[in-house]
A protein has these predicted regions:
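Well-ordered alpha-helical segments within folded domains of soluble proteins
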Residues: 1, 37-54, 99-117, 148-163, ...
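Short coil/turn connectors between adjacent alpha-helices in alpha-solenoid helical repeat scaffolds
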Residues: 1-4, 58-65, 121-125, 166-170
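Terminal, non-catalytic domain-edge segments
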Residues: 54, 58, 117-121, 125, ...
């Protein structure tokens, strides 16, 4: 069974990278807009490269120079969505390119997480823009208008900051500020979901269950699995 599962993983990696291998595209099509390159962990290139990098680390059949070359190429292509003058990642999902929120799913927070973890694997993939993305997080992680969800809210960002602080202690500086904001928010409004216009969602990543999980992680049990990685 293990051998069969290994083959499934290898074939899946080939399927994902096929457009680049055959020269049809310079990037891997993502969800939402299959004709566009997207940045991010949940919806973009960083998440795709991270998953494949973990597979390369574990499976000998995938430990090939050409695969590493493609993964490095994909990260460089994702860098095209970084505005170095205005210092933000671009959200390319809509009709117009706009500044991405500093969130896990499609913004700087998830990109920083993914790229730090990719480099930690030490398999020949170089994920850059770490310093710039960390700066964005330091300046903007607490500026959120979409509730407290894991996906793109305050709880998710706090969990990530706590995890990423092992890489950079400066990130601890904004955790206290965000916790005070969060506590004030809960006392005033109670649970809020991950939508701009609050809905009583019961989904894990967008709704109340994920908020409960995050609060337990932050206040009671930091040994809970880091569900966003």
């Amino acid at each position: 069974m293990r051998y069969k599962i290994k083959n499934v993983i290898v074939e899946s990696v080939k399927y994902i990278l096929d457009p680049v291998v055959k020269g049809k595209k310079d990037f891997v099509p993502c969800d939402f807009r299959r004709n566009k390159i997207l940045a991010g962990f949940a919806h973009g290139i960083t998440g795709i490269v991270y998953a494949i990098a973990k597979a390369v680390k574990s499976i000998n059949d995938l430990q090939k120079p050409e695969i590493l070359q493609i993964l490095n190429k994909l990260l460089k292509e994702e860098n095209s969505l970084f505005d170095s003058e205005k210092m933000f990642w671009i959200d390319n999902r809509g009709e117009e390119r706009k500044e991405a929120l500093t969130t896990w799913c499609s913004g700087a927070m998830g990109i920083l997480l993914g790229r730090e973890e990719i480099n930690k694997l030490n398999i020949g993939i170089v994920a850059d823009k770490i310093k710039e993305t960390r700066e964005i997080v330091l300046n903007n992680a607490y500026i959120l208008d979409y509730g407290n969800s894991l996906c793109h809210g305050c709880i998710g960002n706090l969990m990530l900051l706590k995890h990423l602080s092992s890489y950079d202690k400066k990130l601890l500086g904004i955790i206290e500020k965000m916790v005070k904001h969060l506590e004030k928010d809960y006392l005033k409004y109670g649970m809020q979901t991950g939508y701009k216009y609050n809905n009583p969602s019961l989904s894990f990543f967008l709704g109340i269950p994920g908020e409960i999980y995050g609060l337990i992680y932050l206040y009671y049990d930091e040994n809970l699995p880091m569900i966003l990685l």
